Amino acid sequence: MDKATLTFTDVSITVNVPTGTRIIEMSEKVGSGITYGCREGECGTCMTHILEGSENLSEPTALEMRVLEENLGGKDDRLACQCRVLGGAVKVRPA
């Protein structure tokens, strides 16, 4: 199985993850400060700032783009419950 690296800068932890892993799944396990509510991409609570590696994430869905816009997300923000790590290295922090 292919792997990727995911770094949570707020807790200074880097983990190897299988490709396809959602950011929120590992955030919970490592104790990152990324909060969440619905886990369905509708509330915007898990907005996360992508510091590096956005090209290694799944494309945002129409729902994710709408929720980010409604919650004033910036160009480097994503919903941790929606985006999946596809490979390479990704570095994130709570938004």
Swiss-Prot record:
CDD domains: fer2 (cd00207). [2Fe-2S] cluster binds at residues 38, 43, 46, 81. Residues 2-95 form the 2Fe-2S ferredoxin-type domain. The keyword NAD does not apply. GO terms for biological process: nitrogen fixation. Binds 1 [2Fe-2S] cluster. InterPro entries: 2Fe-2S_ferredoxin-like_sf (IPR036010), 2Fe-2S_ferredoxin-type (IPR001041), 2Fe2S_fd_BS (IPR006058), Beta-grasp_dom_sf (IPR012675). PROSITE patterns: 2FE2S_FER_1, 2FE2S_FER_2. Signal peptide: none annotated. Its cofactor is [2Fe-2S] cluster. Keywords: 2Fe-2S, Electron transport, Iron, Iron-sulfur, Metal-binding, Nitrogen fixation, Transport. It comes from the Bacteria. One of its GO terms (molecular function) is metal ion binding. The keyword Chloroplast does not apply. Pfam families: Fer2. Ferredoxins are iron-sulfur proteins that transfer electrons in a wide variety of metabolic reactions. This ferredoxin is required for nitrogen fixation. Belongs to the 2Fe2S plant-type ferredoxin family. This is Ferredoxin-4. It comes from Rhodobacter capsulatus (strain ATCC BAA-309 / NBRC 16581 / SB1003). The lineage of its organism: Bacteria, Pseudomonadati, Pseudomonadota, Alphaproteobacteria, Rhodobacterales.
